[in-house]
């Protein structure tokens, strides 16, 4: 597995506590700013909609794999992990090794947030978080973020913003967005 060193680029991730927070807007603003500053960058949105490796995640988000409460967080994370690993190996790794900024809309932090939310036991939750980090960064060899920008806003405001939009990259009201208690 490759190790992070000073000769590689940076990985910057924009995350949010729930969908509809304005991540895409902030992503575009940061992207524009980095470009104006002359930084070479590559950007990617996860899940990778419209790709063969993002398709299982899209099916999950549409509810075609069952209700999240009945699915193992480890299984669900595996869908996302494969998407991230293929995108990393096909598109992102080489750019990162060339010193470019990799700007990501969602990444591993999303699995840590969404899948661990369904785990009630604190020790099991910690074990899951450790598992995701080891599995994805060490075993699968994807790049570890240098910076994660985490957006937070009041739930009522986020709900209003989310309800005002038509779809989430072609997935109208995904399984998490339909579950208000989960989103809280």
Feature roles, as predicted:
Residues 16-20, 106-107, 147, 153:
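Generic detector of well-ordered alpha-helical packing
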Residues 24-28, 54-55, 184:
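Short, surface-exposed alpha-helical segments at coil->helix boundaries
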Residues 28-32, 36, 118-119, 165:
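Residues in and immediately flanking transmembrane alpha helices
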Residues 2-32:
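Walker A (P-loop) phosphate-binding motif
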Residues 20, 50-52, 157:
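Flexible, glycine-rich phosphate/dinucleotide-binding loops
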Residues 36-140:
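ATP-dependent small-molecule kinase phosphotransfer cores
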